[in-house]
Structure formats: structure tokens, C-alpha cells
Amino acid sequence: MSEDVIAEIKRDYIYSLANQGDRADGRKFDEFRAISVETGVINKAEGSARVKIGDSQVVVGVKIQPGEPFPDTPDSGVIITNLELVPLASPTFESGPPREDAIELARVVDRGVRESGAIDLSKLCIESGQKVWMVFIDVHVLDHDGNLMDAASLGAIAALKATKIPNSKFGLGEDVKLPLNDVPIGVTAVNIGGAIMLDPSLDEESVAPCKLTVITNKEGAISGMQKSGVGTLTPDQINHIIRLAKEKANVLREKLEGIQ
């Protein structure tokens, strides 16, 4: 049986279940898979976290070092986000230059942190116009079974919550916690036959015409949105996803309570 035929059978099965109000793994449309968050997984990083959503797994490391500020923000720290799709994570991932989806993932993670004002960049100035703290967020995808957007964004903010500024390493005093103002959380949904499903599995992502990620802060304000795929969403569907994203973000945010 050809791969195209198998893919068509899979698609028909997932759409048939959706029409009946079901999903292949038995979850409700608005239900996430099991989530685990662990911090302090990389000893040499200033902060780190491992996040699993179902069988999807990411590890995030945060490194902080002094550097020059951008000319237009001489008194603000710098955020740089990178993401690597480790070849072992999926048969479709290959070594080499960053793939388009890796670049997209990195941008979504970066935008969620930056636009929400999660990090108080004004407190990362060491010497105005000369030296500031540069925050490097490195995301590594270890296993891909769908919804990498949410795993990566959750991993990034978990790692940042566990991060300390290495003042002592550079002769600048005692180490202190990275100043955070907010905890942005991303929630992703797909549209399958008119059914809106949160936390899509890899199979669901593969047959969905599009997906939408909504990142909200603690107050419920949207700090980022990203639509992927050529399919369309109606205004009612978008508003429904936004409502679900705000509700689920509060649940996911609880997973990060207690991180020091």
C-alpha cells in the first residue's frame, strides 16, 4: 500500500472521528495530553527546563552574558532565541541550515516573550549604551509528536523562571533572579472538519489545513498569534480559539508555579 493511500486513510479516519465528536486518542476537543515540566536539567546553563506534552519533548537552555545593547535601546537588555530540530526527533528532520518551520517556531517563542514584556529588559542594563545582559534562549526539540509550539513556549518561560543572572561570574556582585514581569503561555488549536481541537497530535497536525497559536499573558491580553497552513478560519472560530487559549493558559501556568 502506497504512502499516499495510507495518508488518505488516516485523514478520513481522523475526520470521521471529528464528525462524531471524538479524537483518535480519546481526548476531548479542548483537552491537552499529559504535561510534565522539569527545571535544572542543564547544569552549565543559567536556567533550563525539559517539557513533555504527550510524546513531544523539548529542552530549553538559557545563557546570559554581557554584550553591547542595540543602538535604539541603549539601556535595555537583549533577547536572542534559537531553535534546533534535532534529527533524532523525527524522520523528517535533517541536519543542516535551519528549516522554515524551525525559524517559525523560534520567532513565535521569541515574540511571546518579547511582546508580553515577560523579561524586564530595563533591569538588564549594566552600563548605559555600553554593556547590557544578553539573554540567549536555546530550544532543542528532542521528540516530535505534534504541538511543538506550545511545548517550546512553555519550556522557554519555565527555563526563564529558573534563570539567575551570573553577576559573580563577571565580577559584578551576587547572582540574582532574572527579573520577570509576566508568564506568557501559548495554546495551539487546529480546525479539522469544523471541529476546533487543542494540543494537536502529529497525526492531527498532518491532516489539518491550518493551525492557530495564541499567546496570552497573566491578564489574558494577547501578546502573540501565529497561523500556519493554507486553510482558513472563520471569525467565530478564531474567537472560539482565543477564548479557549485564555482558559487553558491559566491551567498551563499552574504547571510553572513553584519554579524558583
From Swiss-Prot:
Location(s) in or outside the cell: Cytoplasm
BP GO annotations: rRNA catabolic process
Any GO molecular function: mRNA 3'-UTR AU-rich region binding
Keyword line: Cytoplasm, Exosome
Matching InterPro entries: ExoRNase_PH_dom1, ExoRNase_PH_dom2, ExoRNase_PH_dom2_sf, Exosome_comp_Rrp42_subfam, PNPase/RNase_PH_dom_sf, Ribosomal_Su5_D2-typ_SF, Rrp42_archaea
UniProt xrefs under Pfam families: RNase_PH, RNase_PH_C
GO cellular component: cytoplasmic exosome (RNase complex)
Keyword Metal-binding found: no
SUPFAM superfamilies the UniProt entry points to: Ribonuclease PH domain 2-like, Ribosomal protein S5 domain 2-like
Record keyword Transcription regulation present: no
Subunit structure: Component of the archaeal exosome complex. Forms a hexameric ring-like arrangement composed of 3 Rrp41-Rrp42 heterodimers. The hexameric ring associates with a trimer of Rrp4 and/or Csl4 subunits.
Function, in words: Non-catalytic component of the exosome, which is a complex involved in RNA degradation. Contributes to the structuring of the Rrp41 active site.
Record-stated family: Belongs to the RNase PH family. Rrp42 subfamily.
Protein name, as recorded: Exosome complex component Rrp42
Organism phylogeny: Archaea, Methanobacteriati, Methanobacteriota, Stenosarchaea group, Methanomicrobia
Gene name of the record: rrp42
